[in-house]
């Protein structure tokens, strides 16, 4: 019996460490608050994603205006996120999170009361409303910088993985609750759909307030300039020789270089070498095609399409997208093992291509069941290419250029994605909503095939000195790639895990 208890204890200890829970626990209260903050926020984002297009339709907005709203909101979130991220370290990260949470609550309050298109658009662009369910505002980049700042290299990947996984589960909960909430509210006396949709934004007010509270109680350790350098400087000034000051200055510069301050936008492109550009031009072209397709068939628009075509109950609609979100979360766990066995490009193509085909055929079924199966295939496999893509970019780009390349990649993808909803809105208004899925599926398939033909034979790690020889066909990845795979798990979404 004692032996069995000892064996169970060892297994529990192994699971505790291997699951990353030990890393999250050791990271401390600030990390817990950051993880909880994003989980609550994604709960609200996904709850609104499920209903916002239907809400606008009930208000009498044209389909074109619905698409235009989503495009402008996405652009507004990106601009706000870029500006605030560049200023965050100077203003104070916690202050920025407090301001973001406040704007989120204010936006929720406006949406819960007003029905004018331009007032709602202003609230969505200036405030923090995610029409696509994506975390494109100022929060995520700052929170990831804070998590990286308060964790060690040994625990960082596990903490970031739980940060993403927890938020995905929160998003699934938001989708499930939103459908039930709307349906239950409409059964109450004096409540109609418009009033119920207004009420869903109460969750925005609540989660915004919680984000403010969490940011208030975080410690000064999360700030970019928090270290013990001032105390050390006092001690040195009292007793150490002047020549040691140069060493202190070098150490201070190294610490500053390790913080997550974003590079200046003007210097990003010029810092990328011509060799890297020759590779990235092709990849950027393909990623732009893929992002345009994603924008045309975003989750909000897909929900709107299902609601108009089949008119399922709001609870059913919520359960469908909640289950799809859980599938997407679970599938990302297998991205790393698949990449080690198939290679990065093969994993990206062989998982994303079935998802693209399901988008192409999505408008064809006349029954809800087959349509939902296609949706599950699409969302279940959709996110598995994100982590391998990040690892592939890291493998073909010089280490000192990765930050610039990642920044340019994110900007191009977002701009392309923002164009999509307006195109779909125009098609939907003319009674050709289904064409958006046809075009989106074709564009995604073009991306997949182009990716395979252009890059499957490319040698990886040619810029890294610790590899004795380059690796062809992406058939193996090293420990650095594995860590990046783990850190990249919704995304993109993420920033893509949620938006497709």
Residue ranges and their predicted role:
Residues 16-79, 279-287, 291-322:
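Helix-loop boundary and gating motifs at the non-cytosolic
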Residues 74-82, 171-172, 325-333, 414-418:
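Residue-level signature of mid-helix packing/kink "hotspots" within the transmembrane helices
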Residues 79-93, 182, 331-344, 428-429:
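Helix-to-loop junctions at the C-terminal end of transmembrane segments
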Residues 95-110, 346-361:
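Structural signature of the two symmetry-related core transmembrane helices
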Residues 39, 107, 115-138, 146, ...:
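Hydrophobic core of transmembrane alpha-helices in multi-pass small-molecule transporters
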Residues 157-183, 412-420:
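Glycine-rich segments within core transmembrane alpha-helices of 12-TM secondary carriers
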Residues 195-216, 435-453:
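Symmetry-related core transmembrane helices of the 12-TM Major Facilitator Superfamily/SLC fold
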Residues 3-28, 225-291, 308, 474:
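Juxtamembrane intracellular "pre-TM" segments in multi-pass secondary transporters
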